[in-house]
Amino acid sequence: METKQCPDMECDVVIAGCGVAGLYAALNLPTSTRVIMLSKGAVDECDSMLAQGGICVLPEGSDYDAFFEDTMHAGHYDNRRESVDIMIRSSRSVINDLLAMGVDFERKADGSLDFTREGAHSRPRIAFHADITGKEITTKLLQAVRKLDNVQILEHVAMTDILTGERDGATACLGVVAVPVDEDNSVRPADELANAAEGVHAGEPFKIHARHTLWATGGIGGVYDHSTNYPQLTGDACYIAQEHGIKMEHLDYVQIHPTGLFSPQPGRTFLISESCRGEGAILLNAAGERFTDELQPRDVVTAAIREQMKQDGTEHEWLSFAPVERDVVTGHFANIRARCLEDGRDILDEPIPVTPTQHYFMGGVWVDKDGRTSMPELYAAGETACNGVHGKNRLASNSLLEALVWGRRAAWHMRTGQSLAVEQAGEPALDGRHRALSADTLAIDDLARAAGTQAVEE
């Protein structure tokens, strides 16, 4: 029997990953750019969908120094200072762009954005949508991408390698090798392949030739027994980078979140958002006693919980919502409450068992301020990449912001060959009308319109 060969595919940009970094990059490319996006699982099975707490934003110019210091302090001052500066000064234009796409952040009575606070933040600066901020943002970005005729999404397709060749006298990335996979990451049967391109056969590797390649494959939680990540996130880009000698950085910088909902069973752990502690929830030991300051950086709180578990001889400690106003619990933390009710615990009336669990990868494939890796024509953004913004320990709610900032910067550099300018820290604050405040928002105005939206009014 003759074996069918999958035809090669061609595009201008191939994006491995459909989280916020990949989606936002696609939206910031011209509609004349042919884009293919790969999702290793279903398109909504990305860690961006799971982000609960919110997304940081510079609420006013006077907060710049404090925001910078909070990020550096959480990262043990091992952060790349240029990256921290870029992220903070890009934050308001990103938020305004999300608002233009219909992202529904919580607001005060006067119509201005409401901000919450989380651990290691010196003030409230986190925009949020209940306790499902990541889902709200990712869903709106995905809706915008699906309106684009120039973007094709292939679900249940994994990147297994990159294509390389000479370009401008150097070895460059010329695309990727991919293969359709099943939900357990095994090769998919031919009759079950969903959303495949015409001529691509299940189980057979195929090539996607592209001018530019963006890695946005997420983290590494799938290699851990207990993680808040989806199991298919197994650090694929890092393995491929190692095989090709692509520069990586800080592979030992792995964040353990203090409060995963305890379960003795292996698999994905449900995250209990840090914003719960930001709103007043407290940690208790087996004797019902508070034992630490809950608003310290994540690694510090994790260490305190582990030490208390050792003293108590337990596999978990307890998180109590007793100090939190009941309407905040039922409103802000409705999703968390519903999940805990599935385990027979109502956070309105009793504490819940929590334990540290793998959550985030600060290291990864080294990139510069424009998302460029050490290999020409290969970019990376989001948890896959290490731009140094988080240092040794990520500040709460900086992950979505970082992914969006570098997804956009990578797209801009692909498009123009130049770095995207950022606003000055002293610009006016976001107000109730959510004005567009920065030069880079204006610069992507045409891209937003191309995505079926319009920029926030100037």
Regions found by a protein language model. Name each.
Residues 100-187, 203-204, 209, 216, ...:
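Conserved redox-cofactor binding core of oxidoreductases
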Residues 212-266, 270, 398-406, 412:
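Glycine-rich loop(s) and the adjacent beta-strand/alpha-helix scaffold that form part
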Residues 1-11, 20, 28, 42-44, ...:
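Glycine- and aromatic-enriched mobile tails/lids
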Residues 41-72, 76, 255-258, 266-270:
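Conserved N-terminal glycine-rich FAD pyrophosphate-binding loop of Rossmann-like flavoproteins
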Residues 43, 240, 246-352, 413-419, ...:
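An anion/pyrophosphate-binding glycine-rich loop and adjacent beta-alpha core
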Residues 1-13, 30-32, 188-193, 199:
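Extreme N-terminal leader/targeting segments of oxidoreductases
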Residues 14-16, 208-218, 380:
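Short hydrophobic core segments
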Residues 13-37:
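N-terminal Rossmann-like FAD-binding beta1-loop-alpha1 element of flavoenzymes
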